[in-house]
Swiss-Prot record:
Keywords: Isoprene biosynthesis, Membrane, Mitochondrion, Mitochondrion inner membrane, Transferase, Transit peptide, Transmembrane, Transmembrane helix, Ubiquinone biosynthesis. Residues 1-42 form a transit peptide. It catalyses: an all-trans-polyprenyl diphosphate + 4-hydroxybenzoate = a 4-hydroxy-3-(all-trans-polyprenyl)benzoate + diphosphate. The lineage of its organism: Eukaryota, Fungi, Dikarya, Ascomycota, Saccharomycotina. This is 4-hydroxybenzoate polyprenyltransferase, mitochondrial. GO terms for cellular component: mitochondrial inner membrane; mitochondrial intermembrane space; mitochondrial membrane; mitochondrion. InterPro entries: HB_polyprenyltransferase-like (IPR006370), Prenyltransferase (IPR039653), UbiA_prenyltransferase (IPR000537), UbiA_prenylTrfase_CS (IPR030470), UbiA_sf (IPR044878). Its cofactor is Mg(2+). The chain crosses the membrane at residues 92-112, 114-134, 171-191, 193-213, 229-249, 298-318, 352-372. Pathway: Cofactor biosynthesis; ubiquinone biosynthesis. GO terms for molecular function: 4-hydroxybenzoate polyprenyltransferase activity.
Length: 372
């Protein structure tokens, strides 16, 4: 026992004396997050391949996390904050990007059905709550499955599970609570939505694993992240597959585009950590591929409008033009080798999607009052 303690002290001195520490070292020494048996079972090769961050880099990551909590999350009780971070409440961009295709399908379905303003507004509100909860559940799943990988990427090293502020067990309990709330929201929708919503759950719970064995994890994320483009129609009493499928595929390609930009933020660390993404698969061809996807996205959105009889509304056709302009402008301007610039243009997709929501809302109001 004495020998073991002495070795631990010497190891601690060597860590403190060095200006560079591994994330695993920081995590193990500060919160005893791993047992001695798990440490001894890890292979030397895995330790050697783990990226090494300076203590300054880790402190900068911690400061950026605290500075990024925002006025709402930072005012929560201290014990609640890590769980709010698990849901990414301080980064609402994901909730918006999940919600926007829902709003398109709801508004298009409302126009096709001639739904009242109160029914449409109510459904937009229900889907808003659902987007917040299920995006949070998706982030919790992602952080639970990626807790080891997150320790090897500086941007994610401060996430609640990776940093040890939330244990894996507590994260699973929290995930269960979020899933129950999400199922409660789903129960408020018509029965036609239930089987369609439940069909998305397998990929929701497994998509974080895709980055381990394929360079196209964005394909899996896009498949589940835009499910609301399908759900909004039956929620409004419409089941029009010729409209639903092209809208879903259009949203799918949009997600592929913006999440590829997101992936370019971490590509240097991803190479070292063995994490795969379209950013690494496409490399210098990324912008050309994104242009092709965006052109296809706009075409599919036009097909959805044509099949629904909504294409020639002033809002739809105008919104389509704004959508196309902003997409191609983003692709031209984004610096894929600059993480901060990638984050800026990734966030810009909120407004891009919102403008189309506003455009559909204009057509809906015009139809509601008999002008279309």
């Amino acid at each position: 026992m004495f020998i073991w303690q002495r070795k631990s002290i010497l190891l601690g001195r060597s860590i403190l004396g060095s200006g560079r520490v591994t994330v695993a070292g920081i995590i193990g020494s500060s919160r005893k997050r791993y047992t001695s048996s798990s440490s001894s079972s890890s292979s030397p090769s895995s330790k050697e391949s783990a990226p090494v961050f300076t203590s300054k880099e880790l402190e900068v990551a911690r400061k950026e996390r605290l500075d990024g909590l925002g006025p709402f999350v930072s005012r929560l009780p201290k014990k609640w904050i890590p769980y709010a971070e698990l849901m990414r409440l301080e980064k609402p961009v994901g909730t918006w990007l999940l919600y926007l295709p829902c709003s398109w399908s709801i508004l298009m379905g409302a126009m096709m059905q001639g739904a009242t303003l109160s029914a449409t507004a109510g459904m937009l509100g229900i889907f808003g709550v659902g987007a917040l909860v299920m995006r949070g559940a998706g982030c919790t799943i992602n952080d639970f499955l990626d807790r080891k990988l997150d320790q090897r990427v500086i941007r994610s090293v401060e996430r609640p599970i990776a940093s040890g502020r939330v244990s894996p067990r507590r994260a699973l309990v929290f995930l269960g609570a979020q899933t129950l709330v999400g199922m409660g929201v789903l129960s408020l929708l018509p029965a036609q939505c239930w089987w369609l919503g439940l069909a998305s759950l397998p990929i929701v719970f497994t998509y974080p694993l895709f980055k381990r064995f394929t360079y196209y994890p964005q394909a899996a994320l896009s498949a589940c992240f835009n499910w609301g483009a399908l759900l909004g129609f039956p929620a409004m009493g419409v089941m029009s597959w010729p409209t639903m499928i092209p809208l879903y595929l259009s949203s799918y390609l949009w997600c592929m585009t913006y999440d590829t930009i997101y992936a370019h933020q971490d590509k240097k660390f991803d190479i070292k950590a063995g994490i795969k993404s379209t950013a690494l698969a496409w490399g210098p061809r990324t912008k050309s591929i994104m242009k092709a996807m965006s052109a296809s996205q706009i075409a599919l959105l036009a097909v959805a409008g044509l099949n629904s009889g909504l294409l020639w509304g002033p809002g739809f056709i105008g919104g389509l033009g704004v959508f196309a302009y902003r997409l191609f402008s983003m692709i031209k301007k984004v610096d894929l080798d600059n993480p901060k610039n990638c984050w800026k243009y990734f966030n810009a997709n909120i407004n891009t999607g919102l403008y189309f929501t506003y455009a559909l809302a204009v057509d809906y109001i015009l139809r509601l009052f008999g002008f279309l």
